[in-house]
UniProtKB/Swiss-Prot annotation:
GO terms for cellular component: chromatin; nucleoplasm; protein-containing complex; site of double-strand break. This is Histone chaperone ASF1A. The gene is Asf1a. GO terms for biological process: DNA repair; DNA repair-dependent chromatin remodeling; muscle cell differentiation; nucleosome assembly; osteoblast differentiation; replication fork processing. Belongs to the ASF1 family.
Amino acid sequence: MAKVQVNNVVVLDNPSPFYNPFQFEITFECIEDLSEDLEWKIIYVGSAESEEYDQVLDSVLVGPVPAGRHMFVFQADAPNAGLIPDADAVGVTVVLITCTYRGQEFIRVGYYVNNEYTETELRENPPVKPDFSKLQRNILASNPRVTRFHINWEDNTEKLEDAESSNPNLQSLLSTDALPSASKGWSTSENSLNVMLESHMDCM
């Protein structure tokens, strides 16, 4: 059983100009004390064509975390516009929130993001070179995709090592290489949940 449940994610300051920071209010619950930190990341998918354009906007360690309910606001700077292909600057992309424990990702929350010009003239005649200062970012907060992964939560790693040697498939299940990429990981996963709410996500 997972020792951490993400109860709620609220998208703050949305919509907002492209260069404004991303802000998410995250509420999670631990069923028991965690001896090590949780690592949270915000990842911006620069292009659906290749994960090489994914940008980790910020990473924060939270912990050690006592049992109970906790809430924090996770803020990250906007992506580096110079690393985004011109063809992918305007339109729909994805932002991901991930959390790992002992280097193992156990949850991923993905949101569609629509970047568009607010001025009619720019929408009808967009410049060849994108003007990011004129773009507005709108996160589809009402329709997150939530993907969960089974990990080893125990302090005793010997137990997992024994299981790996007796079951060679277990290592591949827990390997980060086996996890879906940020660009493609939650689009068709049968473990994904569509959660429909007006302004926030409530994990089931």
